Amino acid sequence: MQVAATSIKPAGTGGWKLALTIVHYVLPPIVGALIGFTSDTLAIKMLFRPYKPKYFLGRQIPLTPGLFPKGQERFARKVAQMLTDKLLTPDEVHRIAQRLLTPERLEEGLRFALLYALGEYSDGRKRARLAVALGDILQEVFSESLPKWIDALSRSSASNKIFEQIFDQVAGSLRIEEAQAVRLAEWIEKNVFTPDRLRLALINLLTNQTIDTLDKEARERAQGGLWLVANVVGIKGPLSRFKSFCVEQPEAANELFTRFLAEAEVRERLTGALNGLSVQTLSMATVQDLKRQFVTSLTAALSAQGPGLSQRLGESIDWSRWAAEVLDRVVTSEKTLGWIDRIAEGSSRLLDRYLTRELEPLVMKFLPALGLEQMVITKICNTSPQELEAAIEQVARNELRAIPYVGMVLGFCVGLFEVFLITVVIPVG
């Protein structure tokens, strides 16, 4: 019996050693893989959970709430800062706006807006309400705002510059054509160079003092045969008798002047003198005098009559009825579509030039006013941890699922390394 027992013991001891050897080699990699998988899975869950802080005996348990719920506001600020500093920078928004706001797209947008407005106001009731609103606005503008603006303009130095520009651009480019010269010469002949006006002007001119002066000048300056006439006969007597003739016999004098004007061809001479006449043909001093008189006259007229005229105009016109008639014609006219195309085309060019010059300053003002950073912070802070977890898992589902398996592989490798250390580097027994 002792022999049998002795023979069995070595066999049992060898089997036990074999089992220990298998566990010695197999267990560390399995345990390492299990630890890696479990720890990574737990770490991922602890990013979001628990959603709220937990307490034990009145004390907050560490690592509660999870990483994202605890630092949600800090996370929101970082995301908002990255969005405004890296993604939606002023230069990037400027490039996006330039790419989107092309002249063609601006024209299409304006055309769509105009057509939409035209369709909206095809309803008579809406059109009537708009007409009343426009009428009230126009009446207020012409009755109150425009008179004040005209009065302020007439008192400022800007009005002088405006009137000077008007004179340079309008009056400076005027030129009297032949037909205009003919009509102007006829008007001057009928209203200025009339026989009666010439007779009265000559009577007023030939005063006794004027006749004496002319007689004296003729005696002193005449030469040759004219000296003999001036000093022997003299011109004082003939001028005095001619004046008496004009005073005493006005009808005969007027007939005489009529024949004189006809024989002198005054109309033809005036037409020739006025044809082609323009401000540019005048001397610089004359042009400056005309400009000064033009500016002074318009400024005085604007100051004296402008506010009152605008106010009377605003009170005398039924602006609501006028606006209703205009809107009815615009909406019902077949030419409106053509006008819309031209308006959209012209407005798009104007808007494109404005945006080319002012887009960058507008973007710099627009971004702070938009408050993107604060809006992102508010949205993220108002998002519940459950929704945030679901959103991140939806975006990185495969990556989050792969992390525990990566941890398992790393744990398995660490277990193999432990086996290597125990069996080779630091053997046991």
UniProtKB/Swiss-Prot annotation:
UniProt-listed Pfam families: DUF445
Protein's membrane topology: Multi-pass membrane protein
Family of the protein in this entry: Belongs to the UPF0754 family.
Name of the protein in question: UPF0754 membrane protein glr0504
Record-linked InterPro entries: DUF445, UCP032178
Primary localisation category: membrane
Coiled coil regions, renumbered to chain: none
Transmembrane segments: 18-38, 406-426
Keywords noted in UniProt: Cell inner membrane, Cell membrane, Membrane, Transmembrane, Transmembrane helix
Subcellular location: Cell inner membrane
GO cellular component: plasma membrane
The organism of origin for this protein: Gloeobacter violaceus (strain ATCC 29082 / PCC 7421)
PANTHER family: UPF0754 MEMBRANE PROTEIN YHEB (PTHR35791:SF1)
Taxonomic superkingdom: Bacteria
Signal peptide as annotated in the record: none
